[in-house]
């Protein structure tokens, strides 16, 4: 087990999984079986020691889709969101256009219901540099909440 787990996991929806991987996902990670990146969220939380941190950048879909409701419940009821930057599309100039919408976050492997995390909504930025500038400005102005 690890004090810190950091990942930018691969994305693979159920349609891209072969039969063996799909069956394993349904059995091992029923709350996140819809995409490989979501299984990585759960696995990384399992790999972190109590009080350890999990830092990831993933697709944003787990925050909104009903298929990830149980995953969200696990995160909110068993862990703590320390910080989150909702990046949306165009977070990486090397990935052109609106190919993937992302979120970057740090979770603590401990439940602290009264903890107030730092949250940034950067979806309106149109480039990697613009999102970075928005983030630096928000933090400097104390708006990361």
Sequence positions of predicted segments:
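Polynucleotide-recognition surfaces of large bacterial nucleic-acid defense/processing enzymes
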Residues: 1-3, 79-85, 90-145
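Short acidic (Asp/Glu) and glycine-rich catalytic loops that position anionic groups and cofactors
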Residues: 19-22, 50-53, 83, 143-145
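Mobile active-site "lid"/loop adjacent to the S-adenosyl-L-methionine
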Residues: 12-33
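Short, solvent-exposed loop/turn and secondary-structure capping segments
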Residues: 14-21, 65-69, 116
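Residues that form generic nucleotide/phosphate-binding pockets
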Residues: 24, 28, 74, 138
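N-terminal Rossmann-like NAD(P) cofactor-binding module of classical short-chain dehydrogenase/reductase
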Residues: 6
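Conserved Class I SAM-dependent methyltransferase catalytic core
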Residues: 11, 30-89, 104-105
């Amino acid at each position: 087990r690890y004090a810190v787990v950091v990942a930018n996991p691969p994305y693979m929806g159920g349609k891209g999984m072969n039969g063996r991987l799909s069956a394993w996902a349904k059995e091992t990670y029923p709350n996140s079986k819809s995409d490989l990146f979501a299984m990585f969220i759960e696995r990384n939380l399992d790999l972190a020691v109590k009080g350890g941190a999990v830092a990831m950048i993933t697709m944003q879909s787990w925050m909104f889709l009903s298929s990830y409701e149980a995953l969200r419940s696990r995160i909110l009821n068993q862990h703590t969101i320390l910080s989150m930057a909702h990046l949306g599309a165009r977070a990486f100039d090397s990935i052109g256009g609106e190919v993937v919408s992302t979120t970057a976050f740090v979770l603590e492997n401990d439940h602290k219901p009264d903890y107030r995390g730092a949250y940034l909504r950067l979806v309106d930025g149109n480039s990697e540099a613009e999102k970075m500038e928005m983030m630096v400005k928000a933090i400097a102005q104390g708006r990361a909440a």
